Amino acid sequence: ILMIHGKDYKEMTKRLLREAELDTRIPDRRCRIGIKPNLVSPTEASYGATTHPEIIAGILEYLQERNYENMVILEGSWVGDRTAEAFQVCGYDSLAKQYGVELVDTQKDSTTSCDCAGMKLQICDSALALDFLINVPVLKGHCQTKVTCALKNMKGLIPNKEKRHFHAMGLHKPIAHLNTVLRQDFIVVDNICGDLDFEDGGNPVVMDRILAAADPVLCDTYVCHLLNYETEEVPYIKIAEKLGVGSADFSKAVLRACNEQEHSVHVPVKRKIVELQDAVEEVESCS
């Protein structure tokens, strides 16, 4: 797991990808590369809920400078908000025009029923058509799962009907099973100013950090460590490990910082999310 600190998010991202030698992981320059941000709702990234467009710009520039051209940004906002509005408000419409890449609204996509390790789930066809998937989640809290990062961000690649179904089944098991088919090839985590309490933002905690990883299970295990949770408190992580998605053995993680952090950030041991979670009554919510 690599990390970098600073304020120039685009250049930080490019340096992080150079350090990770991302281009050596992509099999062919003709590969269709999908970039999956978190645009849960139409709110600017500074609010603490959505992926900073500067990070996506850094990924696109890094790839285009190495002659990768077949790229697409794909996402589906949560039920109740329109992805098209999120693309506009979050700066992705202008980003796509600037770099000449396609935007795919997975809320409007066709789907295929897939066998996800014994669980049938509807998955968007645009995601299934990818050769290489770069996941760009926001490190933040969640009122039901405590944390949301790499594994849960794949939920934006299923239709709204399936999102509701996830909640009817209980989030943890379907999130884990989804990741047996939607395999993340590389992860760039927006740890700039995520809301550590709620998935829709409003209380951003400025950390000015970006992470990179290849294993979504190990990535989310590290996120639990950062936010003072035990891995067992986020059941989908261990379920995903048992399904062969990745490793939750944090003792095997190799952490490397690309630069020094100028200011330390205190993460409270007890936060609002812990108090709220027990009071949440889930009725087909879809975040």
Short names for language-model regions:
Residues 1-287:
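N-terminal and secondary-structure boundary signal
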